């Protein structure tokens, strides 16, 4: 559970998360204290099948109440993010549908974050850098940082994100599609190089 001001009225609400069980879908419920009594004011099934939760973050949405970003594990080791908000006093979905939510799927460990320090949360998803087949065993993976725009996901940046080293390198826009990355076979370091349909390392 978590306690925070979820609707921007300065009073704090209680968010309770329940993971998927044999008899019930994963869900989020919001409670508010009114007149000395704690009341349930909203509950939604999460469109992810979360078997466990990783974190909850709150992110700015211009002109709207904050988004509630819920990271959790679906299946064996797939991390996904459901985004909720408070609308008309109750919980509401931010992302349009389950298909949009599924686009947040990535490897465990790549948690949502405030990448730029501006209060806006982004979701890091991975794909191979240009020049690698999707099933290549030695591919270097690029991270696409997805922000929320209305009820859709919008790419706000690309980069190389190493969980092991704890570092993120953001790619300049001019590199998109023309630069890829390779692993130095001697040092294990990541190197960036020109890509024009072939990898020039």
Residue locations for each model-derived region?
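Loop/turn-rich, solvent-exposed surfaces of beta-rich toroidal or solenoidal domains
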Residues: 53-54, 62-82
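Beta-propeller blade termini
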Residues: 1-6, 52-62, 107-117, 124
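Secretory pathway targeting signatures of secreted, lumenal, and periplasmic proteins
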Residues: 172-201
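Beta-propeller fold detector
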Residues: 39-46, 93-99, 154-159
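N-terminal "mature-domain start" segment
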Residues: 157-179
């Amino acid at each position: 559970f978590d306690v925070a001001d979820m609707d921007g009225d300065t009073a704090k609400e209680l968010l309770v998360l329940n993971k998927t069980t044999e008899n019930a879908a994963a869900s989020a419920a919001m409670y508010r204290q009114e007149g000395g009594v704690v009341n349930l004011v909203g509950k939604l099934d999460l469109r992810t099948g979360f078997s466990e939760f990783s974190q909850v973050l709150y992110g700015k949405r211009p002109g709207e109440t904050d988004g509630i970003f819920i990271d959790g594990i679906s299946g064996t080791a797939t991390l996904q993010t459901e985004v909720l908000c408070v609308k008309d006093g109750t919980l509401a979905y931010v992302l349009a549908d389950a298909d949009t939510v599924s686009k947040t799927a990535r490897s465990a460990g790549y948690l949502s974050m405030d990448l730029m320090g501006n209060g806006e949360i982004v979701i890091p998803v991975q794909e191979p850098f240009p020049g690698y087949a999707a099933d290549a065993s030695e591919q270097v993976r690029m991270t696409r940082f997805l922000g929320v725009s209305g009820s859709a996901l919008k790419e706000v940046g690309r980069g190389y994100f190493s969980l092991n080293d704890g570092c993120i390198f953001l790619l300049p826009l001019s590199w998109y599609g023309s630069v890829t990355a390779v692993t130095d076979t001697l040092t294990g370091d990541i190197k960036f190089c020109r890509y024009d349909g072939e990898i020039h390392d």
